[in-house]
């Protein structure tokens, strides 16, 4: 806004962000402390498929934000009009920060879990998962505390004109939508965990459920049942379905392994 480029400036800033991120990462990559590099090797189709399986969950996670935004915008537009969509913009922008925190936690734990799993250290793997979930729970508690005590303050960042209707929509939306993060953070960590311990099927199912399938179905059904509030609580419903599904698949996989042994 200070430059006066308007929406063009917002688009330009969005394009510059990944370039800045890559530039920062390049500093480490080119330093003497880095021991990871690219080497020419004959490609293996089987190895490529294996790597892709482990990466599908992350791909779906990146894709889901766009899908959710499109579905939510259309549903909210039909129920609450442009002001409802504006309220969702407030909720969505703040949720990006929360998702980024949990994704950072999961991405930080994933290589440590993967290393311990590769070394055949199941005790260390369980310990890392336990600590990851504990930190996740602490962050979730902090987020809920901030949302419920500073709702109007957070909304005012995006509501410079003090629109009362926008405030009312966003106030309810922010509190209901962020209830979903009580479970969302745990799911993000679990998906990263199962990718790290070479269980791509559970990770893929979890990603597709929470990122596309469950969230879309829950949003459509709950919107018809409860209107705008139904859309706000669809995240909690979808994440709960995903969590229960992951637990079921993990339990089923564990029983199968015990039967083989």
Give names to the regions the model predicted.
Residues 1-5, 66-93, 97, 115, ...:
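Helix-terminus/linker motif at the lipid-water interface of multi-pass membrane proteins
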